[in-house]
Amino acid sequence: MFGQRQSMIVYLHSLKHAKILRKYGNIHYISKRLKYAVVYCDMEQIEHMMQKLNKLPFVKKIEQSYRPYLKTEFENSRPDRAKEYDYS
């Protein structure tokens, strides 16, 4: 039903225009102090949306999130000491 989503961080000159970003995706978070918004959209449309957003006059820059491309399954480098001892 839902496709893969990816976030992009949109840095703004002014937060006055932050509501306009709703047309381009789901707004997850808006930082008032640092003047950025985290916007989610489909992975297939991310490049197209970034080009559209770059044309807007109130957008400083856009960064794409690389979280979908990172490995999130970690291996333990040290074995657990409690499992080494046999208490039976």
UniProtKB/Swiss-Prot annotation:
Compartmental location: Cytoplasm
InterPro entries: DUF2129
Pfam families assigned: DUF2129
The keyword Cytoplasm is assigned to this record: yes
Top-level taxonomic group: Bacteria
Signal peptide coordinates: none
GO CC annotations, alphabetized: cytoplasm
Family the UniProt entry places it in: Belongs to the UPF0298 family.
Protein name, UniProt field: UPF0298 protein BA_4142/GBAA_4142/BAS3844
Source organism phylogeny: Bacteria, Bacillati, Bacillota, Bacilli, Bacillales
